[in-house]
Design a protein with these regions (language model features):
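C-terminal transmembrane bundle of multi-pass solute transporters/carriers
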Residues: 1-156
Length: 156
């Protein structure tokens, strides 16, 4: 009901708030370390969203959402930060605007897609496949940035 929905929406916000703080605390505050957490952040989101359909209680679901959005919040914060440090001052506002436009466009499109697919397929099936897809994207991002960091270290 409304109580459960409110708790779950709140859990997303709590996770998105504390995620970047926790990642910064555990990974360090240098630019390279923060930017290297983007892939793991996406993977954490995927793992914990994948576990939600197996949850047996509202409070376990809330916990899983908090952890998932710790990863998602860190990913969004540090990818936005990465764009800011790599963008020249005179273009920064425009690039940030484009970033937010893409983010909210993809958020809308993915919600519409999942809403449509939920009318055709079992919602629990979708709740397993979409997080796996997110995890896969995070893993690919991690591998790409890992190898870029290795090449940078070796050839520096």
């Amino acid at each position: 009901g409304d109580y459960g929905s409110g708790l779950m929406w709140g859990a997303r916000g709590v996770g998105a708030f504390i995620g970047p703080l926790l990642f910064r605390y555990f990974y360090g505050s240098s630019d390279g370390k923060l930017l290297s957490t983007i892939g793991p952040g996406i993977m954490i989101w995927g793992i914990f969203y994948f576990l939600i359909p197996f949850s047996t209680s509202l409070y376990l679901t809330v916990f899983l959402l908090i952890i998932a959005h710790c990863g998602g919040g860190a990913q969004w914060a540090f990818s936005s930060y990465g764009l800011q440090i790599l963008t020249p001052d005179k273009l920064r506002g425009r690039i940030a605007g484009i970033d937010y436009t893409f983010y909210f466009s993809m958020y809308t499109i993915s919600n519409l897609l999942i809403g449509y697919l939920a009318t055709k397929y079992d919602i629990l099936l979708l709740f397993r496949y979409f997080p796996m897809l997110g995890f896969l994207f995070g893993f690919i991002w991690y591998l790409q940035t890992f190898f870029v960091n290795i090449v940078h270290i070796v050839f520096k």
